[in-house]
């Protein structure tokens, strides 16, 4: 009798559930996974090497393009590493703005993660609902930086500019959008950015309730997630898990609480933790994190309303001159030109800065030789540690469960391939 052998299947890199350019080589016994071999590198752009040939400010936009769903959080770790080497501290208002936008970015990331995960499993409505809320948050990015995704808003020593007093309005009516629709859409945009964000934070808890109504007690959703991809706490720590992946396994580790940076020690929030370490618990952790991020944003909005002040450090070697001065003063124009073409020199040394990124612990290790460019930049991407556990998490599961596991890992290849 002929021996029945396992067969090998290519999953991706063109598969819609591969979250980018993941290529998985699956060894299958029938439809049960015996081995999962992730192939990475299809989105490698040599970010770490490119940064060595740019000044510290010119390398900043590369950070946005790492995890291109959590743009400002990537920038945050990078500017914190530079600030450590320079020995400077941004003004308190700039720190609150950074924390507020870190949490807006966390919402952007978790909404994308939740929507795409639900879509992978077969629930299409949640994806559309999540993108409805992401649109408002993208408008916040656009209001402060002019860009909806790659903001380049954080700067060594603070942020690019203070929060605007006006929000962009929707334009003329069309056959798709009448005058009444325009009035409703522009109603929340009649005030400042802080008014717009406050209006969003008032609406958002009800939106999260909508997602939970659709998913949390949904029989099919629970059948697809409960007991899938279980990782116990000890194994999660051994594999290098961080963020929701670690907290979903029951380990209450959050850098915002354990090693507070910026003003996280001045805001009130809780760290949600799972119990079983399966895909369902990780989903619940992300849902709870969205509620906590909303709380933090509300506190930041209240503080920023009552405390005007500078948003950039008073150090002219690092901070650019004011735009108004450049129009009348030749020295300011020369200063601006030299700062952005030649950059600033950073004292020799090394620094590591890590933040609680939406996906986990995102770190930047920066080595300076005293020049105006980094001597070495090393990126610690949380998704890299999560992806290497895919083989272990998927063994013994069906092919359909591999899709669920990839979704729960919240993988973005910009940061994994770098």
From Swiss-Prot:
| The species this protein was found in | Bordetella petrii (strain ATCC BAA-461 / DSM 12804 / CCUG 43448)
Q: Which NCBIfam families does this UniProt record tie to the protein?
A: NuoD (TIGR01962), PRK06075.1 (NF004739)
Compartments annotated for it: namely:
Cell inner membrane
EC main group: translocase
UniProt gene name: nuoD
| Subunit structure of this chain's protein | NDH-1 is composed of 14 different subunits. Subunits NuoB, C, D, E, F, and G constitute the peripheral sector of the complex.
Listed GO cellular component terms? Answer: plasma membrane
- Residues annotated as coiled-coil are none
Q: What does this chain do? A: NDH-1 shuttles electrons from NADH, via FMN and iron-sulfur (Fe-S) centers, to quinones in the respiratory chain. The immediate electron acceptor for the enzyme in this species is believed to be ubiquinone. Couples the redox reaction to proton translocation (for every two electrons transferred, four hydrogen ions are translocated across the cytoplasmic membrane), and thus conserves the redox energy in a proton gradient.
Q: What is this protein called?
A: NADH-quinone oxidoreductase subunit D
